[in-house]
Amino acid sequence: MTFVGAALWSFLRYRPSRVAVRGPSMAPALLPGDWALIVSPRVYRPGDVVVVEHPGRPGYEMVKRLTAAPGERIGERVLGSDEWWVQGDFAHASTDSRQFGPVTREELKAKVVLVYWPASRRGRVTPIR
């Protein structure tokens, strides 16, 4: 496979898109005004930064960190087979699973992989566990 073929295959497989960061809930990893590249992975892992649909507001998407997967413990609770826990890195400015509870796999929309704008913040978004 040529480089162009490999690049095209990768592009089509992961369906990249972009997202604008609007609030401070993911600071310092992501800041208001950042533009990031997002992909649709086959697998999500705790530590990934994800675009998630708010469970109580259909169509409203947020950027959060995936902190626990099905079967993992959050405090006294063990997450069910289709329950994922998301939180903002800057807890005091975040509305997340601590307020609305776990989200489903269907509500996980994409994985944030890199910031491309502004140029001074360009770089990979690293999963943190």
Predicted region positions:
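Extended hydrophobic leader/signal-anchor segments used for secretion and membrane insertion
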Residues: 1-129
